[in-house]
Amino acid sequence: MGMTIAEKILADHSEREEVKPGEIVMAKLDFVFGNDVTMPLAIKKFRELGVKRVFDRERIAIVLDHFTPNKDIKSAEQCKSSREFAKEMGIKWFFEGGSVGVEHCLLPELGLVLPGDLIIGADSHTCTYGALGAFATGVGSTDLAVAMATGEAWFRVPETMKFIYEGELQPYVTGKDLILHTIGDIGVNGALYKVMEFSGSVIEELSVEQRMTMSNMAIEAGAKTGIIEPDKKTLDYVKERAKRKFKVYKSDEDAKYYKVIEYDVTNWEPVVAFPHLPENTVPISKAAKMNIKIDQVFIGSCTNGRIEDLRMAAEILEGQKVAKWVRLIVIPCSPTVYWKALKEGLIEIFLEAGAVIGPPTCGPCLGGHMGVLASGERAVSTTNRNFVGRMGHPKSEVYLANPYVAAASAVLGRIASPEEVVK
């Protein structure tokens, strides 16, 4: 019996000929990482193990991205403990200040996570790297501590659901809409502890960055990871960045899937996920007619803060002004993205429109800082979660959308279609 990409990666990394769903394996890891929120507890657990050194100083990253720049004394202390640990252990890949970016943008951009890798990170959106053909999943700080010490982790081999996207994408429909539509279809528990394998001609046409958006949100359907078979686009992306050798895996033709779901996307349009779950999707044609007034728009995050996302937003915002009483916050997800946005004139477009530009940080996405919502406020956000209180007060509301829709909504002061602005 053939195996899926995910099964092949787990088999190779556990030194087995094959694995089957439900089996428990102990596997060697290619890369592990944590951030300023999850690393301090991992460090504490690491010390409790009595281990004197990490398994490999070049296969661990610490990315201080959630509350950067430090928002208060507590976050400063968390970053300090992570910094001191990195110095003590000689960890090569430590990022803060001018080098830091949102981890799930930064690590692929620097070639630290690669096709065929087995990766764990102490952050739920680690599944982003599945877009490169890696098996990447989030863990807690205790598992991270053990992984830093041993370079290994245990896994229960998940079943795989295959999603096939065919047809032709319409204007302003992006990878964000594909994954939101999918979550709206199967629900937030629709892929619980499954691998979501994305395929089809539409996926082949997507850029690597838009594929990352899709894999990033696999966790919002309960998935273990979201994976895409590497192709020429993938290899072109990683070859100029890769810091080490990598191996490409592809699913066998006779691989067994838990379920196969096929979509024709030809008539799909941008969608908005209403509070308070990503599954509450509404087509923009309907949402735009509901006259939902907003207070804030956030364009950024590990979901939609890459250069292509900023280009989408700038396409709508050029020559426009943000509506009165609306705050538009734009945060490039890495220093490289920020530089590109500057050189391409995107930052100028955002500033002229009336946006606030922030340094690379997770910040507003988790209601951490630099864009926290007050009671009763509504935000349109290009992020991945809209749970109760996600971006601030428990009585605030978050509507998830792609960068085109977010930008149009900022201009009109309500949830709006980009076609209402670009006529």
Swiss-Prot record:
Q: Please name the pathway.
A: Amino-acid biosynthesis; L-leucine biosynthesis; L-leucine from 3-methyl-2-oxobutanoate: step 2/4
The record ties this protein, via SUPFAM superfamilies, to: Aconitase iron-sulfur domain (SSF53732)
- Cite the entry's keywords alphabetically: 4Fe-4S, Amino-acid biosynthesis, Branched-chain amino acid biosynthesis, Iron, Iron-sulfur, Leucine biosynthesis, Lyase, Metal-binding
Subunit comment: Heterodimer of LeuC and LeuD.
Single GO term (MF): 3-isopropylmalate dehydratase activity
The chemistry this enzyme catalyses reads: (2R,3S)-3-isopropylmalate = (2S)-2-isopropylmalate
- Positions binding [4Fe-4S] cluster in this chain are C302, C362, C365
Q: What is this protein called?
A: 3-isopropylmalate dehydratase large subunit 1
**Cofactor annotation comment:** Binds 1 [4Fe-4S] cluster per subunit.
Q: Which cofactor does it need?
A: [4Fe-4S] cluster
Q: Main role?
A: Catalyzes the isomerization between 2-isopropylmalate and 3-isopropylmalate, via the formation of 2-isopropylmaleate.
Q: Which gene encodes it?
A: leuC1
| EC number(s) from the headed UniProt entry | 4.2.1.33
Describe the family membership recorded for this protein in Swiss-Prot or TrEMBL.
Belongs to the aconitase/IPM isomerase family. LeuC type 2 subfamily.
